[in-house]
Amino acid sequence: MTKEELYLKTIFCCIACDGNIATEEVDMVRDLCAKDRIFHNLDSEEYLNSWITEINEQGGAFLQTYLKEINSVELNEQEQLLLVSLAIKAIEADNSIEYAEVKFFKRYVQNLL
């Protein structure tokens, strides 16, 4: 997995972890992918559709696998801060912060650091 894919998957997992992917969250992802040079080489729609299929099939196991993936990736401090920033943007995108999102974010940060 490239770092760009990891960044996008981080956003996806943060918007999916509460069991509901809101329209505002999808709009934020599309807007970010269209405007941010980090994602210019990715077919974000293809990745998102694939991950939606996977999370529908695997449920929470998909998120657990992601947490293991970030634990095994070598990231410098700047990349870690970018991931945290992207995660926060994703969680705040629907203007509602759910307990499941806070819980996932805590586990995410523990695995990241």
Residue positions per predicted region:
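Small-residue-enriched hydrophobic alpha-helices in membranes
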Residues: 1-113
